[in-house]
């Protein structure tokens, strides 16, 4: 299937302020997208709307073998999964073998997840930005490729996995590639390379006022050539564990060439090479 240069279709009875330009999967729906291309689906949003560029899904959704190129919206330039809107059951977004390139939004350049469980496997996120188009300026432009936020409708923590995926050349204010502030997060066998944050977390930002609401595990992953003023690769203020991972040539203008940690951090069997000004800036004992 090909979805090219669309703007708000298949809304059903939903408000005009919601929905993707190509597909809108409502609360009771189940969406399956396979071997499809989404290109130039751009929502020129106005102040106060909640639109994304290509797909909005509230129900369960599976996306595989597809391409999202140059889509744009407010929350999630390519996909927005808003399971927190569900009244009866939690939802899950599953994405595999899919490419996200040149997408943009004010918040989450490619994929925005709000209260949905998620599984992202064998995907590529390249050159996505959380600075977007339009006339609305939020307080923070987070997650160049991905943002995960909010608990489920039932106030339960969401769970998510990212595996075998590559994040390259993405840019945002906080979390150049990805930003998380809710749930149990597991990242394995993934690469974060040449991502940029203009504030904190060149590759990834993990941040929440209540540390119990966000727990992080990273295993067998690489962070190479990422940059930010603070925390060249990872910024975290929550309970985090990193194992069997590599941090190479990451840089921060101020502190934390590879990692800036302000909570409980465990690092095991990992390699740090040529990170500047120092590998880890840590306010608590490792």
What are these regions (language model features)?
Residues 77, 133-134, 280:
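Short glycine/serine- and acidic-residue-enriched loop/turn motifs that recur at repeat junctions
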Residues 77, 109, 176-177, 201-202, ...:
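The feature encodes a structural signal of leucine-rich repeats
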Residues 131-132, 174:
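Alpha-solenoid ARM/HEAT helical repeat scaffolds used for protein-protein interactions
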């Amino acid at each position: 299937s090909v979805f090219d240069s669309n703007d708000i279709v298949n809304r059903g009875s939903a408000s005009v302020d919601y929905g993707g330009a190509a597909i809108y999967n409502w609360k009771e729906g189940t969406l399956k997208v396979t071997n499809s291309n989404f290109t130039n689906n751009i929502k020129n949003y106005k102040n106060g709307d909640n639109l994304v560029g290509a797909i909005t899904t509230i129900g369960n959704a599976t996306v595989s073998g597809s391409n999202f190129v140059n889509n744009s919206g407010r929350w999630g330039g390519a996909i927005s999964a808003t399971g927190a809107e569900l009244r009866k059951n939690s939802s899950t977004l599953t994405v595999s073998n899919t490419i996200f390139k040149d997408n943009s939004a004010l918040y989450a350049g490619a994929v925005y997840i709000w209260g949905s469980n998620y599984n992202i496997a064998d995907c590529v996120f390249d050159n996505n930005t959380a600075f977007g188009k339009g006339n609305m300026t939020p307080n923070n432009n987070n997650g160049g490729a991905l943002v995960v936020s909010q608990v489920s409708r039932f106030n339960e923590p969401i769970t998510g996995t990212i595996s075998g995926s590559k994040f390259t050349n993405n840019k945002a204010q906080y979390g150049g590639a990805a930003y998380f502030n809710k749930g149990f997060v597991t990242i394995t066998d993934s690469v974060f390379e040449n991502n940029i944050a203009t504030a904190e977390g060149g590759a990834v930002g993990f941040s929440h006022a209540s540390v119990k609401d966000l727990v992080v595990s990273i295993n067998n992953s690489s962070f190479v050539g990422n940059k930010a003023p603070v925390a060249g690769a990872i910024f975290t203020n929550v309970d985090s564990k990193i194992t069997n991972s590599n941090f190479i040539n990451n840089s921060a203008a101020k502190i934390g060439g590879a990692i800036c940690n302000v909570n409980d951090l465990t690092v095991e069997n990992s390699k740090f090479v040529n990170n500047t000004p120092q590998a880890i800036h840590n306010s608590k004992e490792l």
